[in-house]
Amino acid sequence: KAIAEMPDFKGYLSDLGGPSANMYQMGGKDTALCRRCKRPSCIHPKVCPNLNTDHQPLLEIYHAVDSLPGIKKSFIGSGVRYDLLLHQSKDAKTNQSTKEYTRELITRHVSGRLKVAPEHTSDKVLYLMRKPPFEQFYEFKRIFDKINKEAGLRQQIIPYFISSHPGCTEEDMAELAVITKKLDFHLEQVQDFTPTPMTVSTEAWYTGVHPYTLEPVFSAKTPREKLAQRMFFFWYKPEERKAIINELRKIGRND
């Protein structure tokens, strides 16, 4: 309401959400189970059956915002967890709210581009990141494209990827380049791994082993190793072509 009343506000909310944009009011159904739980994550490696994944409260927020005087459109720029949109719970009402949320998100709350974060194509690397398998991104993109077609829209899905994450090798990045080329993605939203305190990834990067399994984990650390991974994002740039071909030959990817 305060934003809508600002004199220079034009009626468009650019990002109604934030990190984990579709986890509003989600929590354990039985909190007694949560108190005894030893899992470090409610959504990895799979969504916990005790997690309430009902999207109805969030839909009600969207409807309330859109009904305010002065609000023309509200958009979700990024932060959507598509693994939660694909999750099938045992509650039919919850599944229906998720389906309704997905359609409403795509048809009413995308400003032309929806940014999502598959982060990698290698399931081995994704597991270290505590992210869902890449096949879930394929499925979400299929749904996104289908709903766009049905609604007569021409919106884009913009994936975010990361290089040099612990566990990621040049071979993994070469495969990422092949997959994103097949998907016709000219990647823009990319980043090199940056260690941040209190994360499993940083523990693995610093120690060279996975903190839970104590298995060795490779991490690209030198400038040469990092650049060798990063360049695979940009297979479509002519200036990167020669270096990429040379690197592919080094790792035995003559295809």
Model-derived regions: residue spans:
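Conserved SAM/AdoMet-binding glycine-rich loop
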Residues: 2-158, 163-166
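Alpha-helix initiation and N-capping motif
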Residues: 58, 62, 98-102, 187, ...
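Hydrophobic, well-ordered secondary-structure elements that form the walls
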Residues: 116, 159, 180, 190, ...
